[in-house]
Amino acid sequence: GIPNFKLEKFVVERRTKLLAESGIKFVQNFEVGKDATLNELKAKHDAILIATGVYKPREIEITGNELGNIFPAMDFLTASNRKGLGDKVELFDNGTLNTEGKKVIVIGGGDTAMDCVRTSIRQNAKSVKCLYRRDKENMPGSAREVVNAEEEGVEFVWLSSPKEFLG
């Protein structure tokens, strides 16, 4: 889900190739507990790195969160990245996850929220606002990311939290 403007894919591919050439084995689509137990892995290896990322969205428990124009951040970022790699992405192509020409609001103050607002700017959204429940000084995301987003045209609305989605 990391946007290309933060980490270009060729850098990841180059680094992955170098690591593989140095003897590191990458095992993808592996399910601990199904493909092997954690104890089996511990017995077989000196060290184990589990880097799963956070792909389960936090639901906002307010009225209207089931409306058709509210999406989890990772769905949006993944679709945008895949499209950037040249993949066919139906939800992007049909306009569902493409923010071009749209008024966008992102709720949150972490780095994922900053990725969403900055990606929306790059997709030529009509406007982009970021709502965050605390003030700027207490945002969990990178201060540099906030400055970059502001310079790119994102409007921040501090001390704000939605009470209800209307449509």
Regions found by a protein language model. Name each.
Residues G1-K6:
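Short glycine-enriched, charge-decorated loop/helix-capping segments at active-site entrances
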Residues D111-S120:
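Short glycine/serine/threonine-rich phosphate/pyrophosphate-binding segments
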Residues F10-E59, F71, D75, N81-N94, ...:
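A Rossmann-like FAD-binding core segment of flavoenzymes
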Residues L97-G110:
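Beta1/beta-strand and adjacent pyrophosphate-binding region of the FAD-binding site
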Residues G33, G109-T112:
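Short, glycine/acidic-rich beta->alpha junctions
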